[in-house]
Amino acid sequence: MTSEVVIRKAVSTDMDAMIELLRLLFAIETDFVFDGERQRLGLASLLQMKNTACILVAERSRQVIGMCTAQLLVSTAEGGIKAIIEDVAVREGCRGQGIGTQLLTAMEEWAVKHKAKRLDLLADRRNELALDFYQQLGWQETELICLQKKL
């Protein structure tokens, strides 16, 4: 019998486990190159942004097995706050057990608590398993695309 999964806010001691999850995620997402130090800096910044960002982790038997990040932004289209979700990752041997669903449900609750009117989610268009998963949870593709410019 597998032990219960707990969804909770990440803390600094989760850093190494979260970096490992990002390493696995970035192996799939070809737009990004894994650089553990850069990811550590990014996660540390998110952990400090307590009012406008959230990192949730899924933990089983004291092991972090999944994560999800979100940040609040102002949407002129919505006339208020929206949340953008990134970095949804579940350890490979733990997929298909509802952990991703629990993470996204908890992140939606966090966004509602912070008065968000809409959620946006970034996903790799080639990751068909993830796209199917998101669509099963009610996420819909839009006509918008994400453009990027390095500074």
Question: Residue spans of the language-model regions?
Answer:
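Conserved GNAT-fold acetyl-CoA-binding loop/helix
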Residues: 20-45
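A conserved beta-turn-beta hairpin within the catalytic core of GNAT-like acetyltransferases
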Residues: 74-85, 95, 142
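A short helix-loop-beta-strand connector motif used in the catalytic cores of GNAT acetyltransferases and
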Residues: 47-56, 84
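Conserved active-site alpha-helix within GNAT-family acetyltransferase domains
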Residues: 101, 113, 125-143
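Conserved GNAT acetyl-CoA-binding A-motif
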Residues: 104, 112-122
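Conserved acetyl-CoA-binding loop-helix of GNAT-fold acetyltransferases
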Residues: 90, 96-109, 136
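Conserved beta-strand in the GNAT
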Residues: 57, 63-72, 89
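A short beta-loop-alpha structural element at the N-terminal edge
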Residues: 6-18
